[in-house]
């Protein structure tokens, strides 16, 4: 039986399985696919990765906040995380979704919360990446990024190759000298807004990698796909793009040896390290993004 992307996306939305994962799954996931239940418990993992030459970006799992109070709590938690990264001298960025700061509640609330976060990030020179979510929230997310990029240096965002609009988005952002993380995309979207065929997504991914790098902007190529890694290496070689102009990003717990090999080859390699109790939906979406990762994922989860 071929395990498909839609299968994992279906599982990611299961309330029952999510509840089960919260109740007992964190013991399995912690240290295998997530750093821990909170940021402080993830610090030893960050230190270990840093000692191997790997940079990190941390992400507190859990989005779609529907309370202003919870959104402000998430904001304060993020501010404390940034301060701790600086105090502990960890080589780490911070990633966060705008829905966790109140995107679905009130835009003024999001701007209030992001202003506080980025003021702290600028003070400590810690990069904050605004994660991209589903297509219906894409424009609002990009508008937020554009507004803050005009005022702050330490802010980046994410673009998804499976959306038709992404090449134009890169053109629209060009004047801001943006640091972009480029991904294929993991949400289930209509054929009206996204490429339905993997081959088309792959070709568009190459196209946006090429455009962003040749535009001269720092780029994070977030992929486990060897073909995309090799494409990026060859592109950089052909156009004389220095290794300090881009980085590769991979998920914690997947393809660890490949990550270390890239470091040995002289490439920047950053590990996406999530933490928190809401790990199940994240895990299923990552498998949906590339079902072949299932072997790497479960090997990592069962390794002692």
Curated annotation (Swiss-Prot):
Reaction catalysis annotation: L-proline + a quinone = (S)-1-pyrroline-5-carboxylate + a quinol + H(+)
Keyword Flavoprotein attributed: yes
Gene3D superfamilies: 3.20.20.220
Residues reported to bind FAD: 132, 160, 184-186, 223-224
Active site: 131, 181
A GO BP annotation: proline catabolic process to glutamate
Protein EC: 1.5.5.2
GO molecular function (one): FAD binding
Pathway participation: Amino-acid degradation; L-proline degradation into L-glutamate; L-glutamate from L-proline: step 1/2
Obligatory cofactor(s): FAD
Pfam family, one: Pro_dh
Marked site: Critical for catalytic activity: 272
Keyword Transmembrane helix: no
Keywords: FAD, Flavoprotein, Nucleotide-binding, Oxidoreductase, Proline metabolism
Matching InterPro entries: FAD-linked_oxidoreductase-like, PRODH_bac_arc, Proline_DH_dom, Proline_oxidase
Positions bound to substrate: 97, 285-286
Record function comment: Converts proline to delta-1-pyrroline-5-carboxylate.
Annotated family: Belongs to the proline dehydrogenase family.
Name under which the protein is recorded: Proline dehydrogenase 2
Source organism (scientific name): Bacillus subtilis subsp. natto
Lineage, highest ranks first: Bacteria, Bacillati, Bacillota, Bacilli, Bacillales
């Amino acid at each position: 039986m071929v395990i498909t992307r839609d299968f994992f996306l279906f599982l990611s939305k299961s309330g029952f399985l999510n509840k089960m994962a919260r109740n007992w799954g964190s013991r399995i996931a912690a240290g295998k696919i997530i750093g821990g239940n909170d940021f402080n418990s993830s610090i030893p993992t960050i230190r270990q990765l840093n000692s191997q030459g790997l940079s990190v970006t941390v992400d507190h799992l859990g989005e779609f906040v529907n309370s202003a109070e919870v959104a402000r709590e998430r904001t304060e938690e993020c501010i404390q995380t940034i301060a701790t990264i600086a105090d502990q001298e960890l080589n780490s960025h911070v990633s966060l979704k705008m829905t966790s700061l109140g995107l679905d509640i009130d835009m003024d609330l999001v701007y209030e919360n992001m202003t506080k976060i980025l003021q702290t990030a600028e003070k400590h020179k810690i990069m904050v990446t605004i994660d991209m979510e589903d297509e219906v929230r894409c424009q609002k997310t990009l508008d937020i990024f554009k507004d803050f990029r005009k005022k702050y240096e330490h802010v980046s965002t994410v673009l998804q190759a499976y959306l038709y609009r992404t090449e134009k988005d890169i053109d629209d952002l060009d004047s801001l000298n943006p640091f972009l993380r480029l991904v294929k995309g993991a949400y289930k979207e209509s054929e009206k807004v996204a490429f339905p065929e993997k081959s088309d997504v792959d070709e568009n991914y190459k196209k946006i990698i090429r455009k962003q790098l040749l535009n001269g902007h720092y780029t994070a190529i977030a992929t486990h796909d060897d073909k995309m890694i090799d494409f990026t290496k060859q592109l950089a070689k052909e156009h004389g793009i220095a290794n300090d102009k881009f980085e590769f990003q991979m998920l914690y717990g997947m393809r660890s040896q490949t990550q270390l090999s890239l470091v040995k080859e002289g490439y920047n390699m950053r590990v996406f390290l999530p933490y928190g109790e809401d790990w199940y939906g994240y895990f299923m979406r990552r498998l949906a993004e590339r079902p072949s990762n299932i072997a790497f994922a479960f090997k990592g989860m069962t390794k002692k």
